[in-house]
Amino acid sequence: MKSGTVGRAMEFLWYGHAGRVLIMLPTSGGRQNENEDFGLVEVVRPLIEAGQLQVVCPDSLNRESWADESLPPEEKLRRHELYDRFLAHEFFPWLAERSGRHDPILYGASLGGWQAVTFAARYPHLVSRVIAFSGFFDLRRLTKTWFGGSAYFYSPVDFIANMDADWVARISKVEWIIATGDGDSLAEETRTLGALFGRKGIPAHVELWPGVFGHDWPFWKQHLPRFVP
């Protein structure tokens, strides 16, 4: 679809004809075909064929933002903000109109897990459930020592910690599923976000899969079907 926000066509893949919509974000270097190529679409195919689930895989701007080491962090974030606005103001409304559904699930893993949590916390009226596997939730992992501009609003451990009661009520309407293996180097980020949700009174389902690394496709494929549709 042509995006006025991004200034070019944004590709996507759509699987299914009926049912709830599951939006699968790619990981850091992936494109719209990544989740199919690594078998994630296949593990929910029975739901797709039964008309219970539609899967939509949009392209990202990750290669032109976070993966481009020639860019300063402020420019990486500016480009990511364009992607967020594309999703919020163009893609999600179009999906709702085309599918006739207004209860989408947003899934992401690794960098996509951070994107899913950040997007849903900023636009909770657009998302009914978040599934974030093996994510990080402190933007400083991407920006290092820089934390200027709008960075605060893309760092869940910062902006959720300071949310007022009105915003807490809004994001509490979203179903939050945050998980990874307890052997993942990012496991502490999942613990931290889960504890933060608890302190703010935000219902969330948090899992640390015992005895496994968790930060890889076989684990994501194993656990995703548990949480859809």
Feature names for model-found ranges:
Residues 1-229:
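Non-catalytic cap/lid and distal C-terminal segments of serine-dependent acyl enzymes
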